[in-house]
C-alpha cells in the first residue's frame, strides 16, 4: 500500500466525545454561553480533532512549500520566475513577511523546495523535496505526470509526519511560486465547475491585459486536458503545481495524525480541494484562516463548507494569514483550558426564570 493510501485510510471522524466534553466546559466558563463566538466553536473543533477535551497547542509550525510553474512563461504573472528562488532565500534569511509573523506568534518556519527552477544552496532550514525544475507549461502539456502528482502529495505527507514527530502540534500551510495563482485558478475551476473568469484574479498584480491572458491560458488548458473533477491526482497532474500537491499532502498527513491544520489563502485553498477530492474525511480537520482578495477563494469555501476566521484584505500567501489563524487557535484553546468555571470562581450563574 502506498503512503498516500495508508494516510487516507487513517483519517477518521472527529472525536465526538472530546468535542462534547469541550462544549460542556465552554458552557460553564465564567461568561455568557456563546459570548466568545467563533473562539468557542474553534476550541470545540480542535478538541474533536485532537481527541483531547482541553487541548494545549504549544508547538506551532508553518510549512512553506515553494515551486515554479512552466505556465509562468505565458506572461500570466507580474513578476519573473526567478523571484521564487530569491524569496526562498529571503525566507531562509528570516526577512520575509512570513518570518516576521511567525516570530510574532512563536511558530517555526519550515521551508520546502518542491520544485524551484534553480539549484538552491544547502541550508539547515531548507528541506529538499524537489520534483523538478518547475512544472511543465500546462497550456500545451500536462503540468506533471500522474506519478509525480502522487509523489508530490506523498512528499507533503512526509513533511507533516516529520514535523509532528518532532513535536509540532498545530500546522499552518504556506506557499511561494511565481505563477501559482494561475495553477490554483485552474484547479479551482476544474474541481468546482465554476467559469474560469469567476475564479481568476490578479495574483501578484497583473494588469487588465495580463488578467485576460491568464484567463485565456487557463481556459485553453482545461479544454485541452479535461481534468476529472473527482480525481484530485488527475487535476493536480494536468493543471496543478508541485507545491500545491505538497500542501495537499500536508493537510492529509496532519488529519491522519489528528493534528489541526490551518490553511492560508487561495493557493492553500486549491490544495485543500485536491486533498478533499482524495479524502473527503479531511474536511473537518481544516481550519480556514482568512478570506483572500483572490476572487476564486470564495468558491473554495463554498465547495468545502468552510468559514474563514477573518478577512484583512490579504493576498500575499507564504502562510501569513495561516500563522495569524494559528494564534487564534491557540487563544481559543487557552480560553477553554485556563478560564475558571462559575463553580471554581464562585460566580453566580445565569438566573433561570
From Swiss-Prot:
The protein's matches in InterPro entries, at most eight in alphabetical order, are given as: Nict_dMeBzImd_PRibTrfase, Nict_dMeBzImd_PRibTrfase_bact, Nict_dMeBzImd_PRibTrfase_N, Nict_dMeBzImd_PRibTrfase_sf
Catalyzed reactions: 5,6-dimethylbenzimidazole + nicotinate beta-D-ribonucleotide = alpha-ribazole 5'-phosphate + nicotinate + H(+)
What pairs make up the disulfide bonds? none
**Keyword Glycosyltransferase belongs to the record:** yes
Q: What is its EC number?
A: 2.4.2.21
One Gene Ontology term of the biological-process aspect is:
cobalamin biosynthetic process
Keyword terms: Cobalamin biosynthesis, Glycosyltransferase, Transferase
Active site (catalytic residues): 318
GO MF term (any one): nicotinate-nucleotide-dimethylbenzimidazole phosphoribosyltransferase activity
Protein transport listed as a keyword: no
Enzyme class comes to transferase
Q: In which pathway does it act?
A: Nucleoside biosynthesis; alpha-ribazole biosynthesis; alpha-ribazole from 5,6-dimethylbenzimidazole: step 1/2
Question: From what superkingdom does this record's organism come?
Answer: Bacteria
Family per similarity comment: Belongs to the CobT family.
Which NCBIfam families does UniProt cross-reference here? cobT_DBIPRT (TIGR03160), PRK00105.1 (NF000996)
Write out the function statement from the record: Catalyzes the synthesis of alpha-ribazole-5'-phosphate from nicotinate mononucleotide (NAMN) and 5,6-dimethylbenzimidazole (DMB).
The protein, known as = Nicotinate-nucleotide--dimethylbenzimidazole phosphoribosyltransferase
Species of origin: Roseiflexus sp. (strain RS-1)
Amino acid at each position: 500500500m502506498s503512503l498516500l493510501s495508508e494516510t487516507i485510510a487513517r483519517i477518521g471522524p472527529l472525536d465526538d466525545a472530546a468535542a462534547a466534553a469541550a462544549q460542556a466546559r465552554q458552557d460553564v466558563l465564567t461568561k455568557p454561553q456563546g459570548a466568545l463566538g467563533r473562539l468557542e466553536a474553534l476550541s470545540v473543533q480542535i478538541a474533536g480533532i485532537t481527541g483531547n477535551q482541553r487541548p494545549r497547542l504549544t508547538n506551532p509550525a508553518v510549512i512553506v512549500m515553494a515551486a515554479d510553474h512552466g505556465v509562468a512563461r505565458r506572461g500570466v504573472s507580474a513578476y519573473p520566475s526567478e523571484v521564487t528562488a530569491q524569496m526562498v532565500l529571503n525566507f531562509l534569511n528570516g526577512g520575509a513577511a512570513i518570518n516576521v509573523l511567525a516570530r510574532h506568534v512563536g511558530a517555526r518556519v519550515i521551508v520546502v523546495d518542491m520544485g524551484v527552477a534553480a539549484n538552491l544552496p544547502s541550508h539547515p532550514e531548507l528541506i529538499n523535496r524537489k520534483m523538478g525544475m518547475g512544472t511543465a507549461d500546462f497550456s500545451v502539456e500536462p503540468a506533471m505526470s500522474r506519478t509525480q502528482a502522487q509523489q508530490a502529495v506523498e512528499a507533503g505527507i512526509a513533511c507533516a509526519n516529520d514535523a509532528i514527530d518532532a513535536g509540532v502540534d498545530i500546522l499552518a500551510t504556506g506557499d511561494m511560486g511565481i505563477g501559482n495563482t494561475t495553477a490554483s485558478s485552474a484547479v479551482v475551476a476544474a474541481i468546482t465547475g465554476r467559469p474560469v473568469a469567476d475564479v481568476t484574479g490578479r495574483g501578484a498584480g497583473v494588469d487588465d491585459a495580463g488578467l485576460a491572458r491568464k484567463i485565456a491560458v487557463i481556459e485553453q488548458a482545461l479544454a485541452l486536458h479535461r481534468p476529472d473533477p473527482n480525481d484530485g491526482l488527475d487535476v493536480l497532474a494536468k493543471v496543478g503545481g508541485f507545491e500545491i500537491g505538497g500542501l495537499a499532502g500536508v493537510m492529509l498527513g496532519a488529519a491522519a495524525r489528528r493534528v489541526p491544520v490551518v490553511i492560508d489563502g487561495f493557493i492553500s485553498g486549491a490544495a485543500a480541494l485536491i486533498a478533499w477530492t482524495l479524502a473527503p474525511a479531511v474536511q473537518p480537520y481544516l481550519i480556514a484562516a482568512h478570506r483572500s482578495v483572490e476572487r476564486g477563494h470564495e468558491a473554495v469555501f463554498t465547495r468545502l463548507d468552510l468559514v474563514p476566521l477573518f478577512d484583512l484584505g490579504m493576498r500575499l500567501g507564504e502562510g501569513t494569514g495561516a500563522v495569524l489563524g494559528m494564534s487564534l487557535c491557540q487563544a481559543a484553546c487557552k480560553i477553554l483550558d485556563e478560564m475558571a468555571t462559575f463553580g471554581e470562581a464562585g460566580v453566580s450563574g445565569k438566573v433561570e426564570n
